[in-house]
């Protein structure tokens, strides 16, 4: 067992952090004051009684905003069909594949089709397992209490992610149609599988930390062999070759050929996802015009961390509008749980009036919400439409979601421009829609941020 050495500074900080302040607790006098502060007026009794048996959002629903929203959009990307991630955290994968799906449908005049999310999920979990194990090897000499090691052990594997995962996986492994590797129960319901994998990876982490350095590489392969077996049993064997028939919208067969996953991607998409797409973000806690890189912000160890250009929201809107006008969908992420009316399928600051219900205010700005972990990117969807005024200003936006066709507005969510300002965080846009002055920002040396930065939780 390694001897733990505590420095004088660390000890002093521990003492300060644990020191109790006199009168810092809730004593009888304070409790009496709190009780007196609550006056059971008829209004307060009514609210208390209602909250005892009714969801908060039901009571906070803004009655003046109940009318169905306008579903007209001046510009909309042509899409077909709605996907469903079910009980999994794979929104990032569904969204990225939906961006590619729209391209294939429009390019080849196809009906509804999907790429296999399960195929990509298999390699995503295998690559994340390798990323974790190799990171444990790379931090072999650090103490278990080190912040980086601590973060790794808290986050061994999950099925959340972002566009980096799509670009890494598709460029390395290709894609296949959904019918070639369909979903399984475990791919649709990932919680228990994630628990099993996490438990195994944490066990392996301790074993690797106790292994001689000369044996680490061999040991890792043995561990990944076991992980591979578990993934096969949960998700199936990924195909290395398959036969597929291309059909038009009417169902007429156009061609039947044999493909590998990579040759299929090259024939029907063929883009360099790692070089042709730019990720921009709106993070008001950081300086605009700077490029940021997040440690371990990738799904593949031998891939590259994604780079984010931090921009004012209006610059991001310019690129989004240009892309939609050119019939090109985008990867979009936001804090979807805020002011979401699931029945109407709207994201609108006027959906709920929490202030009136609780007779208080919630004045924090977007910057303050991010700083205090009150908000951040939580879900990815496909940005497909914008409604512009005669002057070209956006009124509202629409995203294609991955919660099934019965969710929201025909499987989509309609976003007011005011909500977009407050809760939109990231957009992945093709390079050709990015102004030259923004592209030049990529020449900067990126500012490296730690993996636990509050802005960069995986989208689920």
Model region roles, listed by residue range:
Residues 93, 119-122, 168, 177-180, ...:
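Structural recognition of the beta-strand scaffold that forms the well-ordered cores
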Residues 1-22:
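Bacterial Sec-dependent N-terminal signal peptides
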Residues 77-89, 151-157, 302-310, 319-320, ...:
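Second-shell loop/turn segments in exported
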Residues 21-81:
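N-terminal regions that are enriched for targeting/export leaders
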Residues 117-246:
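Papain-like cysteine protease catalytic cores
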Residues 69-139:
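Post-signal peptide N-terminal segment of secreted/secretory-pathway proteins
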Residues 87, 95-96, 100, 162-171, ...:
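Stable alpha-helical elements in mature extracytoplasmic
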Residues 21-22, 215-460:
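Active-site signature of cysteine proteases
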């Amino acid at each position: 067992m390694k001897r733990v050495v505590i420095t004088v500074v660390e000890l002093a900080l521990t003492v300060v952090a644990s020191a109790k302040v006199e009168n810092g607790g809730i004593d009888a006098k304070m409790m009496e004051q709190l009780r007196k502060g609550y006056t059971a007026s008829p209004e307060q009794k009514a609210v208390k009684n209602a909250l005892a048996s009714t969801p908060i959002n039901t009571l906070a629903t803004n009655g003046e905003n109940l009318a169905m929203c306008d579903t007209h959009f001046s510009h909309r990307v042509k899409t077909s069909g709605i996907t469903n991630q079910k009980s999994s955290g794979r929104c990032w994968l569904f969204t990225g594949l939906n961006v590619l799906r729209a391209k294939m449908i429009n390019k080849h005049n196809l009906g509804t089709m999907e790429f296999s999310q399960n195929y990509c999920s298999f390699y995503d979990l295998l690559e994340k397992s390798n990323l974790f194990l190799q990171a444990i090897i790379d931090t072999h000499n650090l103490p278990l209490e080190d912040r980086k090691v601590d973060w790794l052990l808290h986050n061994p594997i999950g099925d959340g992610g972002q566009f980096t995962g799509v670009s890494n996986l598709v460029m390395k492994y290709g894609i296949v149609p959904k019918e070639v590797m369909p979903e399984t129960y475990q791919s649709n319901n990932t919680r228990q599988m994630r628990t099993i994998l996490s438990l195994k990876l944490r066990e392996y982490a301790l074993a690797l930390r106790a292994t001689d350095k000369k044996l680490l590489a061999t040991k890792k392969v043995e561990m990944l062999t076991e992980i591979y077996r578990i993934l096969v049993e949960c998700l199936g064997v990924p195909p290395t070759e398959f036969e597929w028939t291309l059909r038009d919208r009417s169902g007429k067969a156009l061609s039947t050929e044999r493909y590998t996953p990579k040759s299929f991607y090259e024939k029907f998409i063929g883009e360099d996802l790692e070089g042709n797409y730019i990720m921009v973000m709106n993070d008001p806690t950081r300086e605009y015009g700077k490029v940021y890189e997040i440690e371990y912000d990738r799904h593949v160890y031998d891939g590259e961390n994604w780079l984010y250009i931090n921009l004012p929201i209006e610059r991001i809107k310019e690129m989004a509008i240009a892309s939609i006008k050119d019939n090109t969908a985008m990867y979009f992420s936001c804090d979807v749980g805020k002011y979401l009316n699931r029945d109407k399928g709207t994201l609108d600051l006027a959906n709920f009036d929490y202030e009136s219900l609780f007779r208080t205010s919630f004045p924090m700005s977007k910057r303050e919400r991010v700083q205090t972990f009150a908000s951040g990117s939580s879900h990815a969807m496909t940005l497909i439409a914008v409604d512009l005024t005669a002057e070209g200003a956006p009124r509202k936006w629409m995203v294609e979601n991955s919660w099934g066709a019965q969710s929201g507005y025909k499987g989509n969510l309609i976003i007011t421009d005011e909500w977009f300002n407050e809760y939109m965080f990231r957009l992945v846009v093709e390079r050709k829609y990015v102004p030259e002055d923004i592209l030049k920002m990529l020449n900067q040396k990126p500012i490296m941020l730690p993996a636990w930065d509050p802005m960069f939780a995986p989208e689920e």
